[in-house]
Amino acid sequence: MNKETVVVLDFGGQYNQLIARRVRELSVYSEMLPYDTSYEEIVAKKPQAIILTGSPASVHGGEAPGCDPRVFSLGIPVLGICYGMQLMAEQMGGKVQPSSLREYGRAVLQLTGKDEIFKGLPDEMQVWMSHGDTIISLPEGFRITASTANCPVAAISCPQRRLYGVQFHPEVRHSTYGMDIIRNFLFEICGLRGDWDLSDFISEAIEEIKNKVGKKRVLCALSGGVDSSVAATLVHQAVGEQLVCVFVDNGLLRKGEASQVIDTFAKEMKMNLVFVDARERFLAKLAGITEPERKRKIIGEEFIRIFEEEKAKLGEIDYLVQGTIYPDIVESGTSTAQTIKSHHNVGGLPEDMDFQLIEPLRLLFKDEVRLVGEKLGIPAEILWRQPFPGPGLGVRVLEEVSFEKLEILREADAIVRDEIKKAGLEREIWQAFAVLPPVRSVGVMGDARTYAYPIIIRAVISEDAMTAEVARLPWELLDIMARRIVNEVAGVNRVAYDITSKPPGTIEWE
């Protein structure tokens, strides 16, 4: 299929996948490529435009990532964002240096000249900044089009060559007119139509899976969560009875989750489902382990070992399906992005794994996964389940995991989710869950001294898990949760509410 394509060159910045997502929201297909992708490979993609992303690096650093400068001479529009703008300026003859006035967070942008990229926008607007360098000398043919109080060169352009740069991050929602800026770039400057939607993704993914798998059999790691459910359904549409779904109860699931998965997929959706009770096995492997990364890798490796064992029972199976999505890949790090945490769907897999992977959702964000699921006819009660980490409660029981701690957390978590549902907030809250820290505190219950665990409630609002704001739950709701937890869950005498956004925190504690 010939479709409009925007290539996003990834330099490792925190928000880079959001850029690709914003472009897709405007019905234009975007594809992320590593910053060092060859000029020939970029040309082979036949892009209508190129976007250069942000980066944690500095353009004047010794190992600054760069792209082939010939991309600026392709004759197609290029938009540089943050580091991308500085790189464009540096590679085309300008100069960048560290700034004495760094900018992190909200800033007020003032337009200093007319430009197509700001068409129809006010002269003053809020933007989101994250930079420590600044352009001090422009390349020939460029002009300054916007500034802030601390950044005299906040946007540049060379309209004759259709080269544009912004120092801020239009892809982040905190930039009030960010989507309008991206829209202007795509439609006013690039002249695109917007000819891509998720129906195209589904048909292409199904065709790709068919071609890859052929007549071979496929094993799906089914958790019952949104991602694995959509991945399983997509693969099932591609290969039908060649797919075998394996559901592993690792003892790290939420209350009632195992029975719900069996009822939904085996009984209602009629999928070929193999159930494995591995609760004791996982707990034995996790005994004495306190470091989060080790827990994640142990859980990921044990999952694979179980699937390999099931493969041996089932006969010849060559492929393993996983519900890996874009944020999993981002947080696991790229060559230029720092690793925040490894995901068992990505960095936690053993090197000697006896499968080839199929990850049909690896280019999608959570909201896109749900839209695909709707198009595939998956029930809403599955699609709107809150995200649940692959390692499950194993990374919500902080430090060492034990049966006792898991039971405490399972009950507390069920109360949190129950009250969110009763309050009608299920679709407003991205995630709401309980965390069990490895400390105990003194309390008093029934005139007696207690020494028990606290429970931390975590609730956030997000669109894509890349950034998240703390959910401002009603005080009355928090009070109900706290009273229920301390009264109904043995071993708990205190409840706290986590009010940290992402960044600086991650959504999960481990």
Swiss-Prot record:
Residues 196-385 form the GMPS ATP-PPase domain. Keywords: ATP-binding, Glutamine amidotransferase, GMP biosynthesis, Ligase, Nucleotide-binding, Purine biosynthesis. ATP binds at S223, G224, G225, V226, D227, S228, S229. One of its GO terms (cellular component) is cytosol. Its EC number is 6.3.5.2. The keyword Nucleotide-binding applies. The active site is at C82, H169, E171. Pfam families: GATase, GMP_synt_C, NAD_synthase. GO terms for molecular function: ATP binding; GMP synthase activity. PROSITE patterns: GATASE_TYPE_1, GMPS_ATP_PPASE. Residues 5-195 form the Glutamine amidotransferase type-1 domain. It catalyses: XMP + L-glutamine + ATP + H2O = GMP + L-glutamate + AMP + diphosphate + 2 H(+). The keyword ATP-binding applies. InterPro entries: Class_I_gatase-like, GATASE, GMP_synth_C, GMP_synth_GATase, GMP_synthase, GMPS_ATP_PPase_dom, NAD/GMP_synthase, Rossmann-like_a/b/a_fold. Pathway: Purine metabolism; GMP biosynthesis; GMP from XMP (L-Gln route): step 1/1. Homodimer. Catalyzes the synthesis of GMP from XMP. NCBIfam families: guaA_Cterm (TIGR00884), guaA_Nterm (TIGR00888), PRK00074.1 (NF000848). This is GMP synthase [glutamine-hydrolyzing]. It comes from Syntrophomonas wolfei subsp. wolfei (strain DSM 2245B / Goettingen).
